[in-house]
Amino acid sequence: PMSDEVVERVLRAVEQVPPGRVVAYGDIAALVGTSPRRVGSIMGSWGGEVSWWRVTNAAGRIPLHLLPLARKQWQREGTHTDGDRCLISRCRADLAQLSADYRAAVADLS
């Protein structure tokens, strides 16, 4: 079963990704201490309240049914894309900064 705290940590981590930047499920998983698959599952169930288009798979892709809306958000934020995916190598968030921001964002959970 998925603990409420893991869900909260994943969502708070996603909230720290700046506009125009993306991270992979694995990047969030490493921060939170869970698996990329669990991050994907949490995003599928609870990610609607956060900037879900900033979290992709390692190739910069997002689930196909979300692509039209994600494309609009990527364009609005100036995210580097190539057709149906983000160019994650060009627009990945600074992971050291993300880690620092995440630690501050979850300080009240420890």
Where are these regions (language model features)?
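Nucleic acid-binding interface residues in structured DNA/RNA-binding domains
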Residues: 1-110
